[in-house]
Amino acid sequence: MNGAQSLIQTLVNCGVDTCFANPGTSEMHFVAALDTVKGLRPVLCLFEGVATGAADGYGRVAGKPAATLLHLGPGLANGLANLHNARRAATPIVNVVGDHATYHLQYDALLTSDIAGFARPVSSWIHETKSAKAVASDAARAVQAARSAPGGIATLILPADAAWNPAERAAERLPDIGPAIVSAATIEDIAKLMSNGKKTTMLLRGRALIGDGLEAAGRIHAKTGVRLLCDTFAPHAEIGAGRVPVERIPYFGEQVTALLAGTEQMIMVGSKPPVSFFAYPDKPSWCVPEMCELIYLAHPHEDGVTALQNLADALGAPQESSTRVPLHLPGLPTGSLNSLSVAQIIAQLTPDHAIYADESNTSSLPLLMMLARARPHTHLPLAGGSIGQGLPLAVGAALAAPDRKVVCPHGDGGAAYTMQALWTMARENLDVTTVIYANQIGRAHV
């Protein structure tokens, strides 16, 4: 067993079953090891930004990390934009970056670079393995770090000689570091605050927008009438008919300010206070009303789902929310295509429990309006604002949930960044329908 084989077997032992790869010479022993160690599915990507974006989509849908395999510092640099998006989404990823052999670094060959320096802004954990015998334990720690609440990018730098030299054995999975528990005192205090008659908003993010978390939020709304909101680019939300309705915060700062006007208490569940996406002259960046009190039920690293359930119980809320989104399908339009008619077609024809990898950008408003009451679905938006994510996100989502339809509504500009994802979709025979909007907002003329 060499270092690469011990690495792959350790990843498999730790529950990692998919690797999005754009390898080069330094990673060839990893590639060769894929033929001898079973259990890790390699997915070839023609560009590193596709690999990192696909790992994000996979992690958001599967709830567990995929691995990436990137070639040296420049390869990592090519993938940084979508690692930025994944960091903002708190997606678990094991980011394996090959490097020159340890003894070769002293010669400063052309591709030598500061890999850790590239990785630092997007990683929650970084480590350079020192030898083949250390690879397995380092990989187990990387998976543990990626899985640690709320989820993060663990970058493991793999020198070529650590991959090809003999290793002893694979490592087993380390215990997960789960979310911190919200104290009973915090639950009690917030239950009292929610009974004070003030105009209250609850801002949800993360697992509070899916499954049991969303249901618990609905119970609280049924009891107190609290307004349920989510971030503009909440990374993973369950939306549509039969679901608890949650309002999405709009994009522009002045719209956010108008939406929140009069709010006296804002309760955060895995979220941060809303701010303007960009700064504009004479426009506020901070969108929370001046006299609004900010209250944290759960920080991102804390168990927001259990906190919501405990808060619902403390309030004496009903066991189920009485408010559900009704199904409303718009029918098929006639006439020419525009952002509204395309949104109507998508909402009408997409089946139940589809996954939307959404980078429709400037065409998004009609689509979000149509999807709000469409068939139940999962919505994965551009979580970090760096365009060129939608197509790779769809690749990862389709591999994580092969039994579900994936739809990728995408602006033309961002799609041009990572169009290589279409090749991976075809090669892997993925069930993805891609709709490219001719937004033409840039209107660049050469």
Please state what every model-predicted region is.
Residues V96, H104-S113, K223, P366-H445:
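Thiamine diphosphate
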Residues A21-G24, V43-G53, T68-G75, K130-S131, ...:
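Active-site nucleophile and cofactor-binding loops and adjacent substrate-binding regions
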Residues N2-H84, R88-A89:
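N-terminal cofactor/phosphate-binding cores enriched in small/glycine residues
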Residues D17-T18, R60-V97, R120-E172, I190-T200, ...:
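Structural signature of the thiamine diphosphate
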Residues P42-C45, P92-V96, F118-V122, E128-T129, ...:
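A glycine-rich helix N-cap at a beta->alpha junction
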Residues A4-I8, V12-D17, N22-T25, F30-L34, ...:
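Active-site diphosphate/adenylate-binding microenvironment
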